[in-house]
Amino acid sequence: MSVIFHENPGTSLGSVVSSDTNPSFNHTLSIETSPEWIDDLFSNVSFIDSTTHQVIRGFCRDVFVYRLPGGFRIRYWDAAILIPNLLFLLFLFLKCTSVIRKLQTGNSPVLRAFTLLVYVSTLVNIIRCVYSMTLSMTDGIEQTVDQTLWIIIKFFYLTAEFCALTFGLLFGHLDNGRSILIALLGTLLVSIPHTAVQVIVEMKIIDNSWLPLTYFDIESDGGFVFWVLSSATLALVYFFIMCLPLVCCQKYTKLPSNGSFFIYCMMMVTLNILQSMGAALILFKSSDGLCFVGVSTYVYFVLYPPIIYFTFLRRKLKTPPNNTSGLFMYRKHKDEQGSGDLPDSYYPRFSGLTSPSYDDLFDYDRDARFTHYDISTNEYVQHPHYNTYSTPLIMSTVETAESTVTTRTGSDDFAHHRDSMLSEPSTGTTTRHLKGLGPQGSLVFEEDPSSLRL
């Protein structure tokens, strides 16, 4: 997404020529004719006639420089961006109490990161608009400050974009402050070089070359090529992310289950395509591209913070504090007595949980079933009926095994049950009811009083 500011309404668009600085400026000046292939592209008179087309193109250029009446030097462009952002900031202030309460009761670093991005982006945008309105735009230093503010706000927005993608695609692996910091550093490695190139392209002294006596001085074609390529690349990235559920990549990353994330990606694809088309039209010396640039840039700097809020934060902030089923929440399951997290190799195969393989559930030492613990020697001893002992894992057809995973560490009942079960010889196949898993992936069977020796 490009940057539009007073001295540069769109990436690589040069300084604005106004009636205050150009005596030859005339409000009734006719609009320069576009190339023939551009005129052919917009020549469908069933939708828009040539006169209306010229008016629209003129409006797309005027909106960046015209100021409010009454002696104020406030541009319509700044006011149009400021008012929606002020309304959204008021909305955020009204939600501030509930947001703080949610952040204090919850333990989600991703939620805090998204909240910070929304508030900071909105505040920086408002500060830029207010400061731009106070500038006379006649001093070169003030113009440079205004350009710098636009670069800063673009940097914040671009970083927020990459953070949203990172949190959305890797939310199952980002559940602590350190992982959030690593993800943020990764996004900075992309946004900082992009912003540096943008500064080099935009902060240049340019001349009035091919569009005389009109609003804009256009820089060299290299800036537009960078603009087209950067916008097209971002559009391809978002489009590829939208296609991830259709390819095998979903085996390696946990994608958001709801559709709001993909709607967000679709909107960003549309905005970046409009930016790329607008830059391409301006590259071919057509002022029609200013309409594409103006619309996409306005939507971006006005609606992006609300899009982030309603896509990633609204549902999570409305959930009760004890609900851990947020969009970007992932936690290990705790055992019943709170003795710690379950092992990383724990893949239960019950409804609502994911298991890569049913065999992984029973991935443990086979010989452990045929040993018992000798208290006198403090070690496990192989059962004498090693070759004849058989305990197949067959569920009874009469009763259904209880879907309960027992994770009590150091349970005396389990040790007593295991020793009693292994101490009695088995001459044939017996059916036992599997209750669940014990410590270290061991099996826990239903109590069978007939097999226990007191």
Swiss-Prot record:
Entry-linked PANTHER family: TRANSMEMBRANE PROTEIN ADIPOCYTE-ASSOCIATED 1
Protein name (Swiss-Prot/TrEMBL): Transmembrane protein adipocyte-associated 1 homolog
Subcellular location: Membrane
Biased composition (Basic and acidic residues): 410-421
UniProt family annotation: Belongs to the UPF0359 family.
Membrane association type: Multi-pass membrane protein
Positions annotated with a glycan in the UniProt record: 26, 44, 258, 322-323
Gene designation: tpra-1
InterPro entries: TPRA1/CAND2/CAND8
Gene Ontology CC annotation, any one: plasma membrane
